[in-house]
């Protein structure tokens, strides 16, 4: 197993303390602390005695006097703001509103400092690991991790060998998923080093909350999140070849049917770069060009939101209609930078995840600042046998799974389901890991006309510009809305919360940035609404100018329909917003 202890539940003393002494609160918090189904979890607003924790005192003071009608009014205001801004995510080709809860998650400055340190450490170590794996492979020669761990990884692409980023950065953006266990300790649940989704909802959640609850922000020192796009643009521009003083950067999207298309469009607009599809680009002489209404334009950096397998039909899926033929050869020649780098999946494979603490110690000579969740490696005989013996009490996860799909919760599974998953583990040990049931921490969440505990996780986003790793203060808090559920994924009924990182009192810059963010979020005067809308439309029209059709062979209607159907299917196969 990847760590020593399997105990993720609190001690009997801690549990009995919470059950024995529970301060009663009235109004919308009535009965909150007596909900036994969540008694084993660490609640982030209330301690075991029902006292409000320090970071949440202002939130509690603001919300506690509210009655059911006021709660509903606040929730309706949030919903209308989201609809007005067109904030949705696509699931199975259908646009849906992204649920935002009205109670923010609050993280103290001291707690965030510890998390930020651990995230930076992890990203730096994984950066060194990827450079080594696609280079000298010293970690394999030294026997620190098994060679077969890499050769058996579906996302280890030999095609990526020889592609050396100009500034040495392969992980331009990372999403490190964290959970808080029953002891209140943050642990890493998963690394996302390819195309982590969700940052657009972080920014839009903040914008919406600031519009609806400006008074709350006025009484808290909440660090801003709106400058994410400027950090990302700096990282992408820094990634270009050193001889490019003004590099051309584009965002490559699978298309409008992808679940994260809203995010692709938002980031491109905020960075002031073109949003393109594969059909807008072509390669000639190992150089990538963009078709525009003004002619061809060379592209220097591509922030791609397309999976490796669809990126280049010359090297991966030959039937891909989303990618650009020859783009890998152009990257190998040093004429374009692909962000994040091809082959990064060998760094966020769920089995590789169990070795990350070892990777950190090997490359940095440091102990991990953030621990993993305890994990069994089913490909090791002794650990696999223990998993099979205890399968009714563990969580079994597919190594290649995403979106919460394929996970089996042993305590909730039927005998038939347990027999089926046992058979799968035996037949493909490399394809599975197992973990104890982690009682994710809880935060008050609106459920009908009351606030009730619901489990949450956290996805902070880190941006590496080659000089430093910057971590967005907070990140995407996802919440499991169905009662008792531990599955937070939006594709399975999850919602989200605005995540507040409180600035230290000494940080004047953070306070000023946060204040400016709130001011920008406030609704403009009515007389300006028409011109504002016109400006948005103009911006979108300018962005679409890059999508000139360019020369092509005529197709009959049947061929066109077939091509469109394939394009839609492949767009939906890409990574979902989770």
Feature annotation, model-predicted:
Residues 1-578:
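Preference for protein termini
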């Amino acid at each position: 197993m990847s760590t020593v202890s399997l105990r993720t539940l609190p001690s009997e003393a801690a549990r009995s303390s919470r059950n024995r002494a529970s301060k009663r609160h009235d109004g919308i918090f009535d009965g909150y602390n007596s909900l036994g189904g969540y008694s084993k979890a660490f609640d982030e607003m209330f301690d075991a005695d029902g006292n409000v924790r320090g970071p949440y005192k202002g939130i509690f003071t603001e919300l506690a006097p509210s009655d059911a009608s006021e709660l509903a009014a606040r929730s309706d205001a949030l919903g209308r703001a989201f609809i007005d801004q067109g904030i949705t995510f696509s699931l199975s080709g259908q646009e849906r509103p992204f649920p935002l809860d009205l109670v923010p998650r609050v993280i103290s400055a001291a707690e965030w400092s510890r998390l930020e340190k651990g995230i930076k450490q992890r990203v730096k170590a994984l950066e060194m690991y990827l450079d080594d794996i696609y280079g000298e492979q010293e970690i394999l020669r030294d026997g620190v991790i098994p060679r077969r761990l890499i050769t058996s990884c579906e996302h280890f692409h030999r095609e990526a060998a020889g592609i050396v980023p100009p500034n040495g950065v392969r992980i331009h953006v990372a999403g490190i998923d964290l959970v808080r266990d029953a002891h209140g300790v943050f642990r890493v649940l998963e690394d996302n080093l390819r195309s982590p989704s969700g940052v657009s909802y972080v920014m839009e959640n903040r914008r919406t909350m600031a519009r609806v609850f400006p008074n709350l922000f006025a009484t808290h020192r909440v660090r801003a999140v709106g400058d994410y796009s400027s950090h990302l643009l700096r990282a992408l521009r820094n990634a270009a070849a050193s001889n490019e003083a003004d590099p051309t950067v584009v965002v490559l999207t699978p298309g409008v049917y992808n679940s994260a298309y809203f995010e692709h469009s938002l980031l491109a607009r905020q960075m002031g770069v073109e949003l393109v599809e594969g059909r807008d680009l072509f390669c000639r002489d190992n150089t990538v060009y963009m078709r525009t209404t003004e002619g061809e334009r060379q592209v220097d950096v591509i922030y791609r939101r397309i999976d490796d397998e669809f990126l280049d039909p010359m090297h991966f899926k030959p039937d891909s209609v989303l990618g650009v033929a020859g783009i890998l050869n152009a990257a190998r020649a040093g004429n374009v930078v692909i962000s994040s780098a091809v082959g990064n999946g060998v760094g966020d494979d769920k089995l590789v995840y169990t070795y990350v603490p070892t990777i950190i110690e090997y490359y940095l000579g440091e102990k991990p600042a953030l621990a993993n969740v305890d994990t069994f490696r089913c490909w090791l005989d002794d650990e696999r046998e223990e998993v099979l013996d205890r399968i009714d009490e563990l969580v079994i996860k597919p190594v290649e799974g995403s979106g919460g799909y394929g996970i089996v919760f042993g305590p909730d599974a039927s005998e038939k389901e347990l027999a089926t998953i046992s058979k799968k583990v035996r037949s493909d040990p490399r394809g599975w890991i197992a973990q104890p049931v982690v009682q994710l921490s809880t935060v008050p969440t609106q459920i009908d006309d009351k606030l009730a505990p619901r489990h949450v996780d956290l996805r902070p986003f880190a941006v590496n510009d080659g000089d430093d790793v910057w971590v967005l203060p907070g990140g995407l808090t996802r919440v499991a809305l169905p009662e008792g559920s531990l599955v937070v994924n939006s594709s399975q009924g999850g919602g989200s919360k605005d995540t507040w990182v409180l600035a230290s009192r000494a940080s004047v810059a953070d306070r000023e940035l946060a204040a400016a963010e709130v001011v920008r979020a406030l609704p403009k005067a009515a007389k300006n609404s028409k011109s504002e809308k016109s400006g948005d439309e103009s911006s979108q029209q300018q962005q679409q100018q890059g999508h000139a059709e360019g020369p092509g062979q005529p197709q009959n209607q049947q061929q066109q329909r077939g091509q469109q159907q394939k394009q839609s299917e492949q767009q939906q196969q890409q990574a979902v917003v989770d």
